Amino acid sequence: MSRLQDVVVNEMKVKKQIDSVEEIQEIKQFIKAYVKSHSFIQTLVLGISGGQDSTLTGKLAQLAVNELKEEGRNCKFIAVKLPYGVQQDAHEVEDALEFINPDTTYTVNIKPAVDQSVQSLSEAGIKLTDFQKGNEKARERMKVQFSIASNTQGIVLGTDHSAENITGFYTKYGDGAADIAPIFGLNKRQGKQLLAYLGAPKHLYEKVPTADLEDDKPQLPDEEALGVSYHDIDDYLEGKEIPGTARETIEKHYVRNAHKRELAYTRYSWPKYNK
């Protein structure tokens, strides 16, 4: 294992192997402890896309909330459907919601807000690319979730896991923004393992992962966009040797996207760019 891989593995907290029961209990306890330590929290809010990560996070959140209720805490889990117009895989969102069984579900169509934002920028002389418009979608979705959390005295859950975090494969202040990230410390295959144990429909965790943000490239697979497979990313995070080209790609993503893992830099931040 290279020196950088050792640093990354320690930072990303991925275990070589997990016990499903222990891991689920640990994540539920983390969520419950956070809620208990913040008396204002009445809701946990999460956007549900129909993909592996939001399905797992949502299920664990609802299980934690169920236990909190049994312990006398008044709180609920809010799932949010956030389509941009008509969502191509809307049936998978419904399947995920049926599996999660959330206390409350809202639907907010982000298309009018995103299109208006793009138009306003265009009128100001700023023409967004399709990729940049995709980031607008991600940020609008997170804006909506924070609005709901604010309105219901809640917090927003993130779906960021370590295979996503290492590559920076998320929109800064979009899906990368949240109050807590319960499934950080898992890689992609471990997330699948937990969903299988929890009895999720197979197609929700065996589907090809996609951010599906670009109009010109609908359902673009994550692995195609990243240029590396989740199998290699997962192996890397578990401290295993992987092909050199895959290692170089992962480490390039890690270094280039370091800014996404940090809060805003100040003049006291390291490295000191003002020198």
From Swiss-Prot:
It catalyses: deamido-NAD(+) + NH4(+) + ATP = AMP + diphosphate + NAD(+) + H(+). One of its GO terms (molecular function) is glutaminase activity. Mg(2+) binds at residues 53, 164. Pathway: Cofactor biosynthesis; NAD(+) biosynthesis; NAD(+) from deamido-NAD(+) (ammonia route): step 1/1. One of its GO terms (cellular component) is cytoplasm. Coiled coil: none annotated. Gene3D superfamilies: HUPs. Belongs to the NAD synthetase family. This is NH(3)-dependent NAD(+) synthetase. It comes from Staphylococcus epidermidis (strain ATCC 35984 / DSM 28319 / BCRC 17069 / CCUG 31568 / BM 3577 / RP62A). The lineage of its organism: Bacteria, Bacillati, Bacillota, Bacilli, Bacillales.
